[in-house]
Amino acid sequence: MLEKEKKCIGIIFGGESNEHDVSVSSAKTVFKALISKTNINRFWVKAFYINKHGVWLDNDQSLVLLKEKRKNETIDKNQVFPKREINFLNTIEFQGIDIWFPLLHGVNGEDGAIHGLLKFTQKPIVGGGILGSALGMDKILMKKIFSHLEIPQVNYLDIQNQDLSDDKVKNNLSVEIIEKLKLPVFVKPANSGSSLGISKAKTRSEIIKALQKAWEIDSRIVIEEGLDVRELECGIIGNLKLTASEIGEVSYSTDWYDYDSKYSMDNQIIIPADIDSQISEQIKDIAIRSCRALNIYGFARVDFFLEKISNKIFLNEINTIPGFTSKSMFPMLWNASGLNIDQLVAKLVDISSDL
């Protein structure tokens, strides 16, 4: 079939965030799915890689990165978009793209920034819109909305507009945290993913170190009570009608589910999770309600805590561009729900066309 008879999917990946490498891995998975035997007669792909300095590579070099296993960022300066080009969105490289598939995890991607940029092209975008992406990325705003809607969450505090370069400020905050929350606590940057910048703190001195670590990533910080929980996850796809996947559980050998354990070979993924059917249905219901509350559509992964001692469900967070790596839960959840990776990626493209 001629390319002009297929839909051209524009993949954007890489980026300046600290989740750059995860984005590259996700893009490789999606690219392979789009050109698989299942989808080769429906789609063809243009790709645009953004390096860690914010420089865009053209389609030819970006496709090389997707097809090869190399990690270097050799750049031919004749094949890079000028960073401040006035006619950026009208460049010939973008012509012919029917649907965008952004796979930028973290800041400038998952926070809705890339969606805002691509909206000017007036082409459909796979995934959520600007508002839902921004709210899903920002843990403080997300939690305030969920509190208003009485969606269950662990107890938390948020820190904003504080100069944490001042040791006195950190000391005072550590005292307040211990007074208001039960130890241990988790200290998180408000806008970060893949557990980057997150620390578990059991003592006041550890809280001070954790505040500094989080503040180096984001000036807005969330502190949550650390309960003894199971980590459960649910996939969501759809627009007006949202559909929930099977529930999955991550079992890990480390003290908590940090960045290294998320991409470790030692994790055990259990799908469906060994939970009561009533709990499973409650999680699916909360996942759908929470996405609707934040105006999230297209696809998302919703993460939950299930307290071991009480079986209470707590919503943790929503990921509006979940990973598509070989170790990512989102495609595994949908595979267990009847959609293999090729079918899932095609489904997400079709959903974007219906908006």
Swiss-Prot record:
Catalytic reactions on record: 2 D-alanine + ATP = D-alanyl-D-alanine + ADP + phosphate + H(+)
Enzyme Commission number(s) of this protein: 6.3.2.4
Domain ATP-grasp residue range list: 143-350
Location (main, coarse): cytoplasm
Entry binding sites for ATP: 178-233
Cofactor binding annotation: Binds 2 magnesium or manganese ions per subunit.
UniProt GO MF annotations: ATP binding; D-alanine-D-alanine ligase activity; metal ion binding
Keyword Nucleus in annotation: no
Role description: Cell wall formation.
UniProt cross-references to HAMAP family, sorted A to Z: Dala_Dala_lig
NCBIfam families in alphabetical order: D_ala_D_alaTIGR, PRK01966.1-4
Protein name (Swiss-Prot/TrEMBL): D-alanine--D-alanine ligase
